Regions:
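Catalytic phosphate-handling regions of large nucleic-acid enzymes and associated NTPases
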Residues: 1-215
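Short, intrinsically disordered, charge-balanced linker/junction segments flanking boundaries
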Residues: 215-221
Length: 221
């Protein structure tokens, strides 16, 4: 090869670019919930798919998984697991059948045996075509919401856990009524106290919680 055709290629620059692209994809498109609506992409796509076919009746979870696969490119198992976890929190999804129990660790029945529909709360607070920004789905056949216009701090109600690339999130769940009271206090510009709470009950020591700021500690059992 002549000297004129030789070219220096800096591999470290390429790896840095590839890593940043991969990290951004995993964190934004899979692992970490968005602070605005409190949802990971798979959760958002599940709720959107349920809204598209909602007629007020229960639908088999196996059917809902299939509907969501039109928007989510990562397979039925991840969709089914995410749907069950949303349903077990008894806020956004109205369930029917054996959905397992987070207190005992019992798993849900197979998707063909359990049913679900959006809860009245979800229908009232989470959807508005006029205030929703849309994007095309991964295959360009459907449109899906970039974010859901949820009128409630769902991220705090559900809590969140996700491990991305160089980034991790762990947010404890909070009490529904206390979140409503805190939201009203914010609107009225009043002070309030808000601490984590759990559907399973228990005891919590918030002496060093520091309002949830970095460095704060909380003990639960």
């Amino acid at each position: 090869m002549s000297d004129n055709l030789k070219e220096t290629l800096h591999v470290d620059d390429l790896y840095e670019k590839w890593f940043l692209e991969y990290a951004s994809y995993v964190n934004l498109d899979r692992a970490i919930p968005h602070i605005h609506d409190g949802l990971k992409p798979v959760q958002r796509r599940i709720l959107h798919a349920m809204k598209v076919q909602d007629d007020g009746r229960y639908t088999k979870v196996a059917n809902l998984i299939g509907q969501t696969m039109q928007y989510h490119p990562h397979g039925d198992a991840s969709i089914g697991d995410a749907l069950v976890k949303i349903g077990q929190k008894e806020l956004m999804i109205d369930t029917q059948g054996n959905w397992g129990d987070i207190r005992t660790g019992d798993v849900a029945a197979a998707p063909r045996y359990i049913e679900a529909r959006l809860s009245p709360f979800a229908l009232a607070t989470s959807f508005d075509d006029e205030t929703t920004d849309w994007q095309m789905s991964y295959d360009g056949r459907k449109r899906e919401p970039i974010l859901l216009p949820i009128k409630f701090p769902l991220l705090l109600a559900h809590g969140a856990e996700g491990i991305g690339v160089g980034l991790r999130t762990y947010i404890l769940p909070h009490n529904f009524i206390e979140l409503c009271q805190a939201s009203i206090a914010i609107i009225k510009k009043k002070s309030f106290e808000l601490y984590p709470d759990f559907l399973t009950g228990g005891f919590v020591d918030v002496q060093n919680y520091q309002d949830g700021l970095q460095g704060g500690k909380i003990k639960c059992r």
